Curated annotation (Swiss-Prot):
Belongs to the YjjX NTPase family. The keyword Manganese applies. The keyword Nucleotide-binding applies. Binds 1 divalent metal cation per subunit; can use either Mg(2+) or Mn(2+). It comes from Caldivirga maquilingensis (strain ATCC 700844 / DSM 13496 / JCM 10307 / IC-167). One of its GO terms (molecular function) is ITPase activity. Its cofactor is Mg(2+); Mn(2+). Gene3D superfamilies: 3.90.950.10. Homodimer. This is Probable inosine/xanthosine triphosphatase. Mg(2+) binds at D65.
């Protein structure tokens, strides 16, 4: 099976490979450039899901012999009632019938100082670099890797989002999710 991924980010490519391995899916990942026009820091769950779905559709249409297209998008989940914001990763998996399944990673709180900068239009990667002095952390251990001092890495969050999105497609779950071949 060939899986198309709308990202060349090494963390995302490795995450999809790892999710396939965990679920015992024999497949290869082919990375393509993401589609143009995706906002760098989606605000809200719907915007983040939409970004993942747009990426997944683009991946599927870019690799004609792929079984699935996968999009992975990190964004900000806002809980205004508690004045708290979370970083969350959403994975979308689309097949040739157009069926989309979604998965989310664990989410972690974004520090208020970081959030203030994001609200001015800055990208999280730039804010992380300013505070930690690590350029392009998103292509490596990620913001979570820096916050957790390496205990949790971005690849872990990406992997969990992807296998959560693939779980409904597993043979033992298809009936539960009312999916047909």
């Amino acid at each position: 099976m060939k899986v198309a991924l709308a990202s060349r980010n090494p963390s995302k490519v490795k995450a999809v490979e790892e999710a396939l391995r965990i679920l015992n899916i024999n497949g290869t990942v082919e990375a393509v450039d993401p589609p143009p026009g995706i906002p760098p820091e989606p605000m809200g769950l719907e915007a983040t899901v939409n970004g993942a779905v747009v990426r997944a559709r683009h991946a599927l249409s870019s690799i004609k012999d792929s079984t699935y297209g996968i999009g992975i998008e990190a964004g900000v989940l806002m809980l205004s009632a508690f004045n708290v914001n979370f970083d969350v990763t959403v994975a979308a998996v689309i097949d040739r019938k157009g069926l989309i399944t979604l998965g989310l990673s664990p989410a972690f709180m974004i520090p208020p100082a970081f959030m203030r900068e994001l609200m001015t239009g800055k990208e999280l990667n730039d804010v992380v670099e300013k505070y930690y002095g690590v350029p392009n952390a998103g292509k490596g251990i990620g913001f979570i890797g820096l916050l957790s001092r390496g205990l949790i890495k971005r690849i872990n969050l990406n992997t969990e989002a992807v296998y959560m999105a693939l779980l409904p497609r597993m043979p033992w779950n298809k009936d539960l999710y009312e999916l047909s071949d």
